[in-house]
A protein has these predicted regions:
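Conserved ankyrin/ankyrin-like repeat signature
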Residues: 38, 71-72, 104-105, 137-138, ...
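Ankyrin repeat domain, specifically the short helix-to-loop turn at the C-terminus of the second helix
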Residues: 43-48, 74-81, 107-114, 140-148, ...
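Membrane-associated feature with strongest affinity for ZDHHC
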Residues: 235, 245, 249-392, 396-551
Length: 551
């Protein structure tokens, strides 16, 4: 690749020395360690200056900012420290605060005249440094509260989104895209954020950028003539190259590319499934029930035949419902009434609560511009966020979510029942017809030769039965446990599916009876979490179990 690798802001001079005993000898070490009493002594008794740098050119205010000591920072400012004073590379205290996400210090600096857009020799502002270190909360804070420019380029033309993509900070990418950062920006080397994510092999970063972007970003070439997919392939990231190439084909207008990528637009495979159902009904009526070379239909066979046809018609009705029904789309920002003077929706996120912090950043949807519910997921095919997202089913050309899961479950139950009964009736019909079979002729040969329509029906029907039974069993098990297909597939990634002890725990499992009752009555299972015992109680319980086993 023609472009040189991005050089991260040097943090070598910002590390606090490790050691058991802290040797506070001057205002700089006192500021770095937050020793307020010694700092006051140095300033008020020893008359030490807070406006001069140390031997390396760094200021006391920078050290206090790096380690998030707001009271120390306030004292330094009140006693001669310049809030906008910069070091040899023109970095201010705000740059240092951004390295470790020191939000409290940032408030002190900016409320005392600090310049939020101050840039160092590389053109890095605080927003760039925050993106380089993945300090999503800090970045959001200075953007929401102090109107920092989150899309500003540095001297090389790279925005914070370039940096977040290069470093692979998925939450920071989500935040920037949520705030409409321009992902089509090319730096001096012609690289977009997607180029940098592909270069480093960051699959999650690439996925977020592709889902939130357009086909133009996939086709952009850098100055060396490489697209993101070609860069990924050149660097040996074959899985990313395959993903990007597939995404590019899916967004192509060429129908051949769409078929190769498995994306057939909004239609999906629903017409195929509907055709299979109609073919099965046609074969069942003409080749099984009304075939002239089969025995006359008895009353019992006729009753079960009509029952099977009724179930099949019911499955078509439910197929239409779960295909056309809203699966639980969450309203997008554009669908909501917007008040230009309203408060920033991300300003009041509680960063002191670690569970809320983690959940909120991962819940930002940069495409729909919403803070989605915990069990919600963005579907790249439907291009919408779905409540209680289970999976996207190409056979119904729709997602399965909170509002259509009951219809989907009824549909597959009806499909299972009708295919099972139809197979039994078909076997019974040909078995009865084989009573006149010649001794020298095998039963299988007789059926294939004399009743090819029944054979074709049974082959297709058995395939449908196996698929429908497997899906029905899986869905029934998940409904009983109040967990979705998506949650089972991503249980390691989702923090809310881990208990206080770090092991898998489903916070929504209220017991089989309640889960099933909620699903049957309301059409969806409950989203209310059950309370977990505190970690100490879990530890005591675990030790008790170990002692009992030992005894």
């Amino acid at each position: 690749m023609a472009s040189s690798e991005i050089e991260i802001v040097s943090s070598e001079s910002k590390q606090i020395p490790n050691g058991v005993a802290v040797n506070v000898i001057d205002v700089f070490s006192a500021s770095a360690y937050g020793d307020f009493d010694k700092l006051r002594k140095f300033v008020e008794e020893d008359k030490a200056s807070l406006s001069t740098p140390d031997g390396n050119g760094y200021y006391a205010l920078q050290w206090a900012s790096l380690n998030n000591f707001p009271d120390v920072a306030q004292y330094i400012i009140e006693h001669g420290g310049d809030v906008n004073q910069h070091d040899n590379v023109r970095q201010t205290a705000l740059h240092w605060a951004a390295v470790r996400g020191s939000i409290a210090v940032a408030d002190v600096l900016l409320q005392n005249g600090g310049r939020v857009e101050a840039a160092d020799v590389n053109g890095y502002r605080a927003v760039h440094v925050a993106a380089q270190y993945g300090q999503t909360g800090f970045l959001n804070h200075i953007v929401a509260k102090y109107r920092a420019d989150f899309d500003a380029p540095d001297n090389e033309g790279r925005s914070p989104l370039h940096w977040a993509a290069y470093k692979g900070y998925a939450d920071t990418i989500r935040l920037l895209l949520f705030r409409d950062a321009y992902q089509g920006r090319q730096d001096r080397e012609g690289c977009t954020p997607l180029h940098w994510a592909a270069l480093r092999g960051n699959i999650e970063a690439c996925t977020i950028l592709v889902h939130a972007g357009t086909k133009q970003e996939l086709a952009v070439k850098d100055k060396a003539g490489f697209t993101p997919a070609q860069i990924a392939s050149d660097k040996g990231h074959r899985h990313i190259a395959l993903f990007l190439s597939k995404a590019q084909r899916a967004q192509s207008n060429d129908w051949k590319d769409k078929i190769r990528s498995g994306k057939m637009g909004d239609v999906g495979l629903a017409p195929v499934l509907l055709s299979i159902i109609l073919i099965l009904i046609f074969l069942f009526i003409n080749s099984v029930i009304a075939a002239p070379n089969l025995p006359k239909v008895t009353a019992v066979v006729g009753l079960w035949g009509w029952t099977t046809l009724s179930l099949a018609v019911g499955s078509i009705m439910m197929f239409y419902r779960c295909s056309s029904q809203d699966p639980g789309f969450v309203k997008r920002l554009g669908d909501l009434s917007k008040d230009t003077d309203s408060e920033d929706p991300l300003l009041n996120i509680d960063l002191n609560n670690s569970s809320v912090w983690t959940g909120n950043w991962s819940q930002l949807c940069p495409t729909c511009k919403i803070i989605r519910p915990v069990r919600c997921k963005h579907c790249p095919t439907c291009k919408r966020c779905i409540e209680q997202f289970d999976h996207h089913c190409p056979w119904i050309s729709n997602c399965v979510g909170k509002r259509n899961k009951r219809d989907f479950f009824i549909f597959i139950c009806l499909a299972t029942s009708s295919s099972f009964l139809a197979a039994i009736i078909a076997v019974q019909r040909v078995w009865t017809a084989a009573q006149s079979l010649h001794i020298e002729e095998s039963w299988i040969r007789y059926v294939v030769v004399h009743h090819p329509g029944v054979v074709a029906f049974l082959v297709l029907d058995v395939i449908v039965f196996i698929a429908a039974t497997t899906l029905t069993t899986a869905q029934a098990s998940q409904i009983a446990r109040n967990i979705t297909t998506n949650e089972l597939a991503n249980s390691i990634r989702y923090g809310y599916l881990r208990g206080p002890d770090g092991h898998f725990r489903n916070p929504y499992n209220h017991g089989c009876r309640k889960n099933c009752a909620d699903f049957l009555v309301k059409g969806y299972t409950d989203d209310n979490e059950i309370a977990w015992p505190p970690l100490q109680q879990v530890a005591v319980s675990s030790h008790a179990k170990i002692r009992n086993r030992a005894s």
